[in-house]
Every structure is written in structure tokens, then in C-alpha cells.
Amino acid sequence: MDIRAAEITAILKEQIQNFGQEAEVSEVGQVLSVGDGIARVYGLDNVQAGEMVEFENGTRGMALNLEIDNVGIVIFGSDREIKEGQTVKRTRAIVDAPVGKGLLGRVVDALGNPIDGKGPIVYTERRRVDVKAPGIIPRKSVHEPMQTGLKAIDALIPIGRGQRELIIGDRQTGKTAVALDSILNQKPINQGTDEKAKLYCVYVAVGQKRSTVAQFVKVLEEQGALEYSIVVAATASDAAPMQFLAPFTGTAMGEYFRDNGMHALIIHDDLSKQAVAYRQMSLLLRRPPGREAYPGDVFYLHSRLLERAAKLNDSLGAGSLTALPVIETQANDVSAYIPTNVISITDGQIFLESDLFYQGIRPAVNVGLSVSRVGSSAQIKAMKQVAGKIKGELAQYRELAAFAQFGSDLDASTQKLLNRGARLTELLKQSQFSPLKVEEQVAVIFAGTNGYLDPLPVSKVREFEQGLLLALRSQHPEILEAIRSSKEISKDTTEKLTKALDAFAKSFA
């Protein structure tokens, strides 16, 4: 038998080349103790802060406390099946969520998993849920209006695309209703073809009842608004870490639109419950408590979340993310810890009052305490033209109404102001699920500030408004079209509108 050394060498070399070490190394730790949704783990020495870890039974958690001898992990889900001594392994991934247009029309949990029974989600990419907000250079000042469809807000407390406007008030004052109407009002724009005008909506429900969230989704579906919306739900029965994470997940989904030259609106309903969930986690992790037992970094929690809402400059695609955070107060106390924090972070607040709500003024916006720090730069010119006057007249009305209670002998001009104020207040009332287009709001407010409501009894104002809108839509659509296209009330439009109002006022009387 002839053995060739060269041949054997070649075979050996080939064997050595193909020899691969099929061993997978994963870093693991051991559960020291578990309870109240918190696990203490020994051995994960190289774990990162905010990293996702996986327990033996497949449950996931996030490493939050990195201490000398152990790691504090918050558990996303139930801790019942996790036992002392079980292994925990690193995933080497910071908590992320799926993003993209494939999520539109879906209801997901705080980790981006579908919970609506409509099958798996088709997503574009995955993004980290907690990222750094854009700096000063990438931003641009807010200048495009974000119409809510509510006269009281669009005229007096305008919101721009890229703004953060807080909705604050006691329970049952219509905070969610304002947010819902803002979503419904985007339907006509989103049915168009102009991608730059569309506004995609993300609604984050934190700590709410499942029935409430189901009702909200049902309304969106019935009104045809679910197709451009994403609902992120961490309900009251979900673990505190899920309630803490949901707003970050929703923001990551909104940022996808912002960073790709589109516009998005995110509603956090509500951040008081997120703060409570964060307080619970922090106390269980034995972090030192501060004011009202909240941890010292609860301000940073909300500021890093809300700073991600921004209007980007043209070189980055001019996209925007508008945030409407909701805060629930106790007995109208806006000076509590969380309300003052969020007021100082946002660019203004819409203050809803239970007293006004019970008087039948809905939306129950307290115009005196509410403010938009972006102001009229977030309004079209037509709205600026009519809103300036209504603001002034309502301010005078509020001032005089306080004095009018003391004396009955008021002069004619004061009486006239009081009458006008009462009618304008009535005019700003609006039913739920009936947002108005901006040109219709302009026409209605024009009628109010030009004295067309003064001869009417207050009880007839709403009827007059409905009749006027019907008349304008059917007989004078060109007036509304002129306001919509030119975005201002020109001299010609003023004449036409005055003529139409005179004719309608005569027929109404």
C-alpha cells in the first residue's frame, strides 16, 4: 500500500479547517430572591443598565439596579413561576419595540406584542424604547397648526406640530374626550394623499381599566380613525414595569414617523399613573424616596420622555412628534409634585375644571388658567384674525363677571360686554365626537365677535351655530373653500361672509 505524505497532509489540513467549536456561551445568574415583581439576581456581573434579561420560564425583565453583589431586575409580567435558585440569562439587548406603519390599526402591550387578536405584527424595524432626545441644532421652531377640532382649544390655546401641551384636570372632567376628539379630527387630512399633511396618532393607555381601553378602541374603529392610530395599552391589571414602560414604547413608535419626515401625535393617558408605577418600582428596589415618596429622578423620567416630542429641521426631513400628556389632579390641586413637574416641562397646559364641567360648559376648559406657550405661531392667519378679538372679549368678561355679582346697576357698555361674553362662552361649547374643520370654526367665531349672537337669547346660540354651519356648507361652500385654501380672511371673503351672515340672521330671527 502506497502512502503519500503530501496527500495525508492535505487531508489533515482540510479536516482542521472544517473543525469548528460549536459552543454557545451565555452569561447567566441565579435568582437570590423574588417578590412584588422584583427579582434580586447574583452573577450577572457584566449586565448593562436597562438590558433585557430572560428567566428560565421565558418571562422577561429589565435590569435597573446594578449593585456590588447583586442586580435588581423588574419583571415584565407575573413573578409567580419564578423561583429562588433559577437561572437568568442576559439577552445583550437594551429594551426595544417594533416600529413602522405596520402597527397602524393595532393594539399592542408595553413590549410591542399584539393584544388585539389580529395576528402577528409586520414591522419595519425595532427601536430602543429609551433614547436620547434630539438636541438644539436638529430642531426647528413650531409653526404648523395641529388642529384638535375644538373651538375652545384651536382659537384660544393653539397647539402646533412638535409642541408638548399638557391636558390637566380632575377625574371625570373630559381629559380623554379632548384627546379622542383630537385623534378623530385628523380623519379628513389622513384620508387625503398628501403624506406631508397626514398626522398619525399613538394613544398610550397607562393604568386604565381594560373596559375603558376597549371602549376607546371601539370608538376609534366606529369613527374610522383606528386605521391611522396605534394603541399601546398597559392596563391597571398589568405589572408596574409595564405601566412604566408603555409611554416610552409609544414614543419610540411615534419617533419612527418623526424621523422619516412624517408627522405624529402621541397621547399619554395618563402620566400620573406612570409616576405611581415608577414610585412602586423604585421603593421596591430600595431607592431612597423623596417628596410624596416619589424617587428623586421622577422629574427626569418625565422630562426625558417629553423632550422626545420635537419639530425637526428641514435637513432632517421636517418631521414632527406632538405630545399631549394627561395628568390627573386631586381636587383641582395643580401645585402637587407631579402636576408642577409636568407643567414646567411642557409648552403650555389645557386646564379642565370639574365646576365648569358640571355647569355644562364642555369641553370644560378654564380659559384663564390654560395657556399655550407657542401661541399664535401655531395658528393659520384666518384663525389669528378672529381669535385675537375673542380672547380679549372673554378676558374682559371674566373680569367684569366677578364684579357684576356685587351690583345690579351696571352701565350699558358693561352690560353689553357681559351679554357678549355669555354668548361667546356658549359658542365655545361643543359636543363630543363632533370636531369642526378650521374654516368652519373661523366662520362661527367671526359671527360671535361681530355681534351676530348679541340679539339672541343664550339658549338659542347652539341652534344658531348649527343652522349657520348648515347654510354655509350647502349655500356658500365657496366662502369656506376660500378660507381653507388661502388660510386667511381677505377683504373679499369678509364681505361675502358678512352678507351670508346678514341673510342667515334675518331668516333665523
UniProtKB/Swiss-Prot annotation:
UniProt cross-references to Gene3D superfamilies, sorted A to Z: 2.40.30.20, ATP synthase alpha/beta chain, C-terminal domain (1.20.150.20), P-loop containing nucleotide triphosphate hydrolases (3.40.50.300)
The keyword Kinase is annotated on this UniProt entry: no
Localization (cell): Cell inner membrane
Residues of the site described as Required for activity: 370
Residues at which ATP binds: 169-176
Domain of life: Bacteria
Keywords linked to the UniProt accession: ATP synthesis, ATP-binding, Cell inner membrane, Cell membrane, CF(1), Hydrogen ion transport, Ion transport, Membrane, Nucleotide-binding, Translocase, Transport
Identification of the protein by name: ATP synthase subunit alpha
Annotated source species: Xanthobacter autotrophicus (strain ATCC BAA-1158 / Py2)
This protein's encoding gene: atpA
